[in-house]
Amino acid sequence: MLRTLALALTLAFTAIPASAQNTERAVFAGGCFWCVESDFDKVGGVISTTSGYIGGQNANPTYENHPGHREAVEIVYDPGRVSYEALLSAFFRSVDPTDGGGQFCDRGHEYSTAVYAVGNAQLAAARNAKSEAAQALGGVQLATEIVPAPQFWPAEEYHQDYYTKNPLRYRYYRSACGRDNRVREVWGSEAMAGIKGS
């Protein structure tokens, strides 16, 4: 009886860390949120991704009504497995940070790149990562904004995990939009570094 109780308690306490992990958040705007979500779901240490809107004028934005908002992805990650700095490096190398008018075939502010820092430590790390990315690209001016994170609003359910729900449409869109080709043009051998299977 005591052995059974001890075993049950051991199993219960070893299960706690999995459900009560130490997690942190990162928020990146990198053009179409379907693509950013797909890319970061492949990064080890990322626990979840959520497509949404951030930085605009209205509460509860929708795809049809999100003035001033950018499409963005909120990333929940385990800092014991992946650092914020590694996420930043992967982010910069998965977009064209020199383009201030949008990303790839998607044009306009809502598709422009930004890092929304959650706290001062992330703000400093993001500024450093932007500087390092600019140097890696030969000292060019980067258009990616680095700003404190306001409220993040999750997008409609049909946008979540779009690449798994509609794989053919997603692959067609990503290819036709020229995302991967442009990232390779900008970054060369560093393109998509840190993102598995890319």
Residue ranges and their predicted role:
Residues 2, 19-198:
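Flexible coil/turn and secondary-structure edge motifs
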Residues 3-14:
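Bacterial N-terminal signal peptides
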